[in-house]
């Protein structure tokens, strides 16, 4: 994992995997690194263990999106690990912890928009209120500023 910033991903007190992101862009090195590399993320919302006493969460695609949102003060933000990884199991986890309202803040690209619509439909099936937060082009939750976040999440 040399050359990577590594983040251990826990859920329910158990280490599920380690995710790394390259500190530099090298053509011979993948940008992201996950060990074990065959880990199934369909049942992981991170950091679910740390989101407590709230019925409202913000869903973002990646760990670095989540870290930025937490740094901005939004400690109810959960990472879903990509646009294709919001599953029925994750929906059940949100239901289990009592979530009744969700803001979906995915990247403003075709994949993010399509996934946000899918997540909204899944949440609707459980009567969980949701809204899609439309980010300006070129801005994802990983680089969002405090002022812009406050304006978008009103």
What are the language-model segments listed below?
Residues 1-5, 139-154:
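Short, small/acidic-rich helices and loops at N termini and domain boundaries
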Residues 1-98, 116:
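Phosphate-handling DNA/RNA-contact segment within nucleic-acid enzymes
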Residues 97-108, 147-154:
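A polyampholytic, Gly/Pro-enriched intrinsically disordered region
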Residues 59, 100-111, 133-134:
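Acidic beta-strand-to-loop metal/phosphate-binding motif
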Residues 130-138:
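A generic structural motif
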Residues 123-130:
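Short acidic, glycine/proline-enriched helix-loop-strand junctions
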Residues 92, 110-121:
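Mg2+-dependent endonuclease catalytic cores in nucleic-acid-processing enzymes, primarily RNase H-like
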Residues 81-86, 107-109, 136:
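Short, acidic/turn-prone active-site loops that include or flank metal/cofactor-
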